[in-house]
Amino acid sequence: MKTKTESKKCAPKATAKKVAVKKSANVLLERTDKVVTKDKNSVLKIFGPTYKVSAILNEAMNEARAAETGLPVAKVLEVLKLRDHWCIRREWIEGKTLAETMAGDKKNLMRYLKEFVAIQCEIFSKTSERMGNLADKLDKQISASALPKETRYDLHMRLQSMPRGKALCHGDFNPTNVIITPSGDWRVIDWSHVRLGDPLADVARTYLLFWLSGHVAAAEKYMALACEALKVKIADVQKWLPIVAAAESSKEQSVKNHELLLHWASVVDYE
């Protein structure tokens, strides 16, 4: 593996203020400038002031478009404004995430990973005429990254040479976003990053998500299974890794993850 000159070390962007919620709220997830709570039989995603209204509406629209493909997703019920915060209300899905299931039954990791890959391939089999392309999003994120100008240029050129694709790509496909219902059915949630693109780019991002969460062994097993299912070589996915890592580094990350992503983004070739 060859790397370019070490990129300058840059700390992640400053964090935005957290969204304030009632003490009685059933908080499911808390991230920078957004909170997800359970509200009776629905899930409420509450956005902070840094989110543009157009981006929130677009997220809801993309989730509706994903549902129109026939995939089992959490349906968007409404977009509303509560206490000066824009929100998206979705249906509540009973069950456990695949991440919880895997953590509680580690001896069957390979079986769960195979199911995980099968679900992702089912998503790849869908498309939509009214959805943005992943390559365009990656291009903008590379421009916004903290990488040196020369490295960003190289990545832009590499991205232009990669296939754009028209497959539905979840954009944040990881075991925490797959829910297994009591009946054994699966539902995929959090479609805020969905785009059309090359499936291998989405596989590369999922691989990085395993890495960033500390599940390195699972990342390698996932990569092998995904490549086998898609009938491609691991090297084909690895071509996307620097591009996807650079794009991911443009978001807020812990210092450790940020530096890891900058390293991946500096990779020029795989041997």
Predicted regions and their residues:
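ATP-binding glycine-rich loop module of kinase domains
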Residues: 26, 30-56, 64
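Active-site acidic catalytic loop and adjacent metal/ATP-binding pocket
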Residues: 35-38, 157-201
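Structural motif at the C-terminus of the N-lobe alphaC helix and the adjacent alphaC-beta4 loop
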Residues: 61-72
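Short beta-strand micro-motifs within the conserved protein kinase catalytic domain, predominantly
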Residues: 75-86
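Conserved short submotifs of the Hanks-type protein kinase catalytic core
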Residues: 84-97
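Internal "kinase-insert"/substrate-recognition segments embedded within catalytic cores
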Residues: 106-136
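An alpha-helical support segment within catalytic cores of ATP-dependent transferases
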Residues: 125-171, 181-182, 266-268
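Helix-rich C-terminal or lid/interface subdomains of diverse kinases
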Residues: 205-271
